[in-house]
């Protein structure tokens, strides 16, 4: 019988970012209790030796599983040290992979207080609304003019430490274009 391959999207992430993610998840599970329903699975609880950890986030009758890996093949650059993250949505026997933005939106729908679009309608109806959004990573678009006006009145409260964002975990901070301050290009290229 032939070998069968299963392809999975694994976001290449540096080790320090994964460690920060794990610390934030554990802090909000055990200390702040904002993520008390989440489940953290250690590497020694997994049968796969490449799995570093798993975070199971219940979403109603489904769940989001964020798996961190170690010991993968290194990437093209020196800092790609064989660490990675996969994000999976599971419901009963069905599972699919999701991108970090969608993962943050799914987390935001089920956890953390939010001052959202529905706040405008609820405010007009005289209902009490949450004064601010605790999980800004869950919003990926610019709100309506009314939403922006109401949000401008209420400054977001900085939560220390911040809530764990999947988008922030998988963000590629190495390949972004560098920003130089003050100078308009190279001195040698400008002829100065």
From Swiss-Prot:
Effect of residue 148 to A: 35% loss of interaction with CUL5
Residues where Zn(2+) binds: 108, 114, 133, 139
Ranges where the record places region Interaction with host APOBEC3F and APOBEC3G: 54-72
A single MF term (Gene Ontology): RNA binding
Basic residues: bias regions: 176-186
Induction: Expressed late during infection in a Rev-dependent manner.
Membrane topology: Peripheral membrane protein
A single cellular component GO annotation: host cell cytoplasm
Region (Interaction with host APOBEC3G): 40-44
Cited Pfam families: Vif (PF00559)
Region listing for SOCS box-like, in residue ranges: 151-180
Motif HCCH motif: where in chain: 108-139
Motif (BC-box-like motif): 144-153
Interaction with host APOBEC3F, as annotated region: 14-17, 74-79
Modified residues annotated as Phosphoserine in this record: 144, 165
Modification note: Highly phosphorylated on serine and threonine residues. Thr-96 and Ser-165 are phosphorylated by the mitogen activated kinase MAP4K1. As the HIV-1 replication can be activated by stress and mitogens, these phosphorylations could be involved in this process. Ser-144 phosphorylation may inhibit elongin BC complex binding.
Multimerization, as annotated region: 151-164
Keyword Zinc-finger listed: no
Outcome after substituting residue 169 to A: Does not affect interaction with host ELOC
Main localization category: host cell
Domain note: The BC-like-box motif mediates the interaction with elongin BC complex.
Note: The infectious clone pNL4-3 is a chimeric provirus that consists of DNA from HIV isolates NY5 (5' half) and BRU (3' half). Vif-defective viruses show catastrophic failure in reverse transcription due to APOBEC-induced mutations that initiate a DNA base repair pathway and compromise the structural integrity of the ssDNA. In the absence of Vif, the virion is morphologically abnormal.
Name of the protein in question: Virion infectivity factor
Gene name per UniProt: vif
């Amino acid at each position: 019988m032939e070998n069968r391959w299963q392809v999975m999207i694994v976001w290449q992430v540096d080790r320090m970012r994964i460690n920060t993610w794990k610390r934030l998840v554990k802090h909000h599970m055990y200390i702040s209790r904002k993520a008390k329903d989440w489940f953290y699975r250690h590497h020694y609880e997994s049968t796969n030796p490449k799995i570093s950890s798993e975070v199971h986030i219940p979403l109603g009758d489904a769940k989001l599983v964020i798996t961190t890996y170690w010991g993968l093949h290194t990437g093209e650059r020196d800092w790609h040290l064989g660490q990675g993250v996969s994000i999976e949505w599971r419901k009963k026997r069905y599972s699919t992979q999701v991108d970090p933005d969608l993962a943050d939106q799914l987390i935001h729908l089920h956890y953390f207080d939010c001052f959202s679009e529905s706040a405008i309608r609820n405010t007009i109806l005289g209902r009490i609304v949450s004064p601010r959004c605790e999980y800004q990573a869950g919003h990926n678009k610019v709100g309506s003019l009314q939403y922006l006006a109401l949000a401008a009145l209420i400054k977001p409260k900085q939560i220390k430490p911040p809530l764990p964002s999947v988008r922030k975990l998988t963000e590629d901070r190495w390949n972004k274009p560098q920003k130089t301050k003050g100078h308009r290009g190279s001195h040698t290229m400008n002829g100065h």
